Amino acid sequence: MFVKIGNATDVAEGNIRAFDVDGTKVSVANSSGHLYAFDDTCTHMGCSLAHGKLDGTTVTCPCHGSQFDVTSGNVLRGPAQRPVRSRAIQVEGGAILAET
């Protein structure tokens, strides 16, 4: 099931923004005009990935430097050992719809 979480214009290119999806923080990253959604909480120590740095399709956690691929949620560099949950996303009529 998909729910509206915001508008595509809410996430500028090269940025990440956290939204609430049924009580869970979900980050949406805009990499070169493509939007990717993933759970906002780093699997290492629980820091918000929305406060991290986006470089292409790699987000770096601001707390301890773990890196994740925003397209899949996979860990690219520790200390995190587990991926973040990647979520399907759609844009319809300018609205961002994320998988619950």
Predicted regions and their residues:
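Short glycine/proline-centered loop/turn elements that form peptide/ligand docking sites
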Residues: 78
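N-terminal pre-ligand scaffold of iron-sulfur
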Residues: 1-56, 69-70, 74, 83-100
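Short loop/turn motifs at secondary-structure junctions and domain boundaries
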Residues: 58-60
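Short amphipathic alpha-helical segments, especially helix-boundary/capping motifs
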Residues: 15, 62-63
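Short Cys/His-rich metal-coordination motifs, predominantly Zn2+-binding knuckles/fingers
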Residues: 45, 63-64
